[in-house]
Amino acid sequence: MRVAIVGGPGVGKSTLVRQLADLYHHGAYGEGEKGVWDPRVLADIEAGRNPVGVTAYFAQLYDANYRDASANDHADRVIFFEGARLTLEAHIAEYPAEYHAALREVLAIGDHWNPDRTIVLTSSTDTIEKHIRLRSRPHEEAEQMVGRFRLIDAEFRRLAPSYPNSVVIDRDGKEFHDRAGLDEIIRLAHLPPYQEIPYRVLKRYP
């Protein structure tokens, strides 16, 4: 089973991917960040430059992940991905209309990904601003990022119904470093149960 986790900037996608993958022990694919990406990408995103190149770059990152996972996906596994075709389409709204036709051509890269479930995370802007300030990335300016979030979040909400197996989840009040928060996401997304590794009081092993 392939589960994509998507949403606007600062909503907690990377954290949720890592945490759920650690619960299921079946693997995960993040989208990376500074240090993984070509160093020009962040500058171009911030300046609004090269929209087709930026979108194609992330599409190819996602495509490499989905292709690699296809060799490991089995009926009893739950593999998590940060990013989906929906991500590429939602971000088109960031760019001027003159680029939209070319950006839609890039979407074809993701036509074969077809995750079995797409979790669309949404949140209030107050929560997003708090998360962005807490992670304190040097290339991010909080007010600008909150503005980006509002725009992209609206697109995710609008587009989600057109993607099969997508579920929109408001993450406000759900802590991803808390088991109750993770269990709530699993319940809302209708994911299969994970196998708990028991903790025991031992004097000897085995």
Regions found by a protein language model. Give the residues of each.
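Conserved substrate/cofactor phosphate-moiety recognition/catalytic segment
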Residues: 22-67
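Hydrophobic positions on the alpha1 helix immediately C-terminal to the Walker A/P-loop
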Residues: 16, 20
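Hydrophobic anchor at the beta1->P-loop junction of P-loop NTPases
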Residues: 5
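P-loop (Walker A) phosphate-binding loop of NTP-binding proteins
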Residues: 8
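Conserved lysine of the Walker
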Residues: 13
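ATP-dependent NMP and nucleoside kinases share a basic, alpha-helical "lid"
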Residues: 70-73, 79-138
